[in-house]
Design a protein with these regions (language model features):
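Transmembrane-lumen/periplasm boundary regions of multi-pass, lipid-linked membrane glycan transferases
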Residues: 177-284, 295
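Transmembrane-helix motifs of polytopic, lipid-linked glycan transferases
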Residues: 79-100, 120, 139-143
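Transmembrane-helix signature of polytopic, membrane-embedded enzymes
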Residues: 92-115, 134-135
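Short helix- or helix-capping micro-motifs
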Residues: 16, 109-118, 163, 167
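Membrane-interface transmembrane helices that cradle and orient dolichyl/undecaprenyl
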Residues: 140-158
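Membrane-interface alpha helices of multi-pass inner-membrane proteins
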Residues: 47, 155-171, 181-182, 205-208
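Short acidic/glycine- and proline-prone juxtamembrane loop motifs at membrane-interface regions
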Residues: 124-132
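Membrane-proximal, lumen/periplasm-facing interface regions of secretory-pathway glyco-
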Residues: 306-313, 336-393, 403-419, 442-448, ...
Length: 498
């Protein structure tokens, strides 16, 4: 296969299609417990609205449409995720082809995404909105570069559509737009493209696409920004000097953590050739250098301004994942022949395509090897089956405090509405009578199953004070693929009309 990719680089598309089909089947073979992002999508699939929480709604909309057509199932959740991941790679390959002459280098850059742990591992398990953003980044940059190279009405329209969708994927897409705008202005043909009348069409299309959510955002700014800003300011130091040091150092550390595996692989494969004539540049290396430099400056300004010290690597992934294209550009203009190194390099992603699915299966089927259970192993299916059978009826509403149990329970009871008090803005109609009681569920901690205050308050405020303290029970259910005695605890109660 590695030799075939050198001869036919476009075959990378079929290779990736097969890989994500395998990943889809692997997810179906894994336990049906959902991790946080999967659970959120299962929960949010009940609504098709202009806004949900602190993230823009693009991914949620796609997931909701799929569920409305095919119904809620693990297959519906996993198919959307793997489709988006496949689109990331395909659009990345298209972007690489826009700036690289050699198709082999484009294939190398694309498969280099399998050397970024935050992408090949975290994105496979979580990162729904980030994955959607990566697709829109690739499409947007394709539109920008195509417009710079050969402007047309179609390229301006395409760029506007990608820009609008990008702003619907994640809000920090605005950082990329700012970086791209500066990079365009610094390009030899950039100003002519910006002052072209067709650029107004690009802006108009993007505004129209974003407008419905933008109006929602104006009326829900606190909801959309509060949680993210809270995470950013978490553990922020009080002293000004510490703010100027701790945040930037964390930023630099994350850049190194994300970039290091790719750089190590490239150094091993390309050796001294990687750094030979590294000082050479062309219009596209300068474009990416300016793009990434502007983004870095803006992030540093944010860090210093709000005292952001608790950053997550997923926030930088949408920018640093462009590194392989930049490195391949540098090597191509230095005269390095991709075919000379392609056979050696392609071993790495091909091995990763085998290792990653195997690790996913091993992690969930043999949790004792890792000393802890993953969310996949939480026995929601057995818990729901047990309590519904014991009660002899299904609930009219499932109510939880957090979204992790809410989405998992909704997956097990897809015909029953579910709500999480973590998202008080997302409510739904439900039946409540003697044959359809309300089921309240939470995961008990060291409180011995005492009902969370939020649930008690909801029952009191919504149903009446007489319902604020219902009878509750504890259920211990063995973890999926756990040993006897390895139990997951659930607390629950059935609330009937009085």
């Amino acid at each position: 296969m590695h030799r075939f990719l050198v001869r036919r680089p476009d075959a990378v598309i079929l290779l990736l299609a097969g890989y994500f089909l395998v990943e889809f089947l692997v997810r179906l073979a894994m336990p049906h417990g959902l991790r946080y992002d999967e659970s959120q999508q299962a929960l949010f699939s009940q609504w098709l609205t202009f806004g949900y929480d602190s993230q823009p709604p693009l991914y949620n909309w796609v997931q909701s449409i799929v569920v409305s057509v095919f119904g809620l199932s693990l297959a519906a959740i996993s198919s959307v995720k793997n489709l988006f991941l496949f689109l990331v790679y395909i659009s990345y390959y298209r972007l690489a082809r826009e700036v690289l002459t050699d198709k082999v280098f484009a294939a190398i850059a694309t498969l280099s995404l399998l050397t970024i742990p935050q992408f090949f591992w975290e994105a496979q398990r979580d990162l729904t909105h980030t994955v959607a953003q990566l697709v829109t980044i690739n499409l947007f940059l394709c539109g920008v570069i195509r417009t710079l190279k050969a402007p047309s009405l179609g390229s301006y329209i395409f760029t506007g559509v990608a820009l609008g969708l990008g702003m619907l994927s994640k809000y920090n897409f605005a950082l990329l737009v700012a970086g791209a705008f500066v990079a365009v202005l610094m390009h030899p043909q950039g100003r002519a493209r910006v002052f072209d009348k067709r650029f107004l069409l690009t802006i108009a299309i993007s505004v129209l696409i974003f407008l419905p959510h933008g109006l929602w955002l104006m009326h829900n700014l606190g909801l959309a920004s509060g949680r993210t800003l809270g995470i950013m300011e978490q553990n922020a130091p009080d002293g000004a000097f510490a703010k100027f040091v701790k945040g930037p150092l964390k930023f630099l550390r994350l850049i190194l953590v994300i970039s290091a595996p790719t750089l190590v692989v490239y150094a091993l494969v390309f050796g001294k050739s990687l750094f030979r004539n590294f000082g050479r540049s062309n219009e596209w290396t300068r474009f990416f250098e300016i793009l990434l430099a502007v983004i870095a400056i803006l992030v540093l300004i944010l860090i210093v301004t709000i005292g952001m010290t608790d950053m997550r690597d997923r926030w930088l992934l949408p920018f640093l994942f462009l590194l392989p294209i930049y490195l391949c550009l540098k090597m191509e203009i230095a005269g390095i022949k991709a075919a000379d190194f392609g056979k050696r390099f392609f071993y790495v992603p091909l091995v990763m395509m085998v290792v990653i699915p195997v690790l996913l299966l091993v992690r969930t089927f043999f949790p004792s090897l890792f000393g802890a259970f993953d969310h996949y192993n939480t026995p929601y299916p057995a818990f729901v089956q047990q309590i519904v059978a014991a009660e002899g009826k299904k609930p009219g509403l499932v109510l939880t405090d957090g979204w992790l149990p809410a989405g998992n329970l909704h997956l097990q009871l897809p015909d029953v509405p579910a709500m999480s008090l973590f998202f008080p803005n997302l409510t739904t109609d439900y039946a409540w009578n003697a044959s359809r009681p309300i089921l309240i569920v939470w995961r008990p901690g060291k409180d011995n199953g005492v009902m969370p205050v939020e649930l008690s308050n909801w029952l009191r405020d919504t149903l009446g004070p007489q319902y604020a303290a219902p009878d509750t029970k504890l259920a211990d259910v063995q973890y999926i693929h756990g040993k006897p005695g390895e139990m997951a605890s659930f607390a629950y109660g059935w609330v009937y009309p009085k």
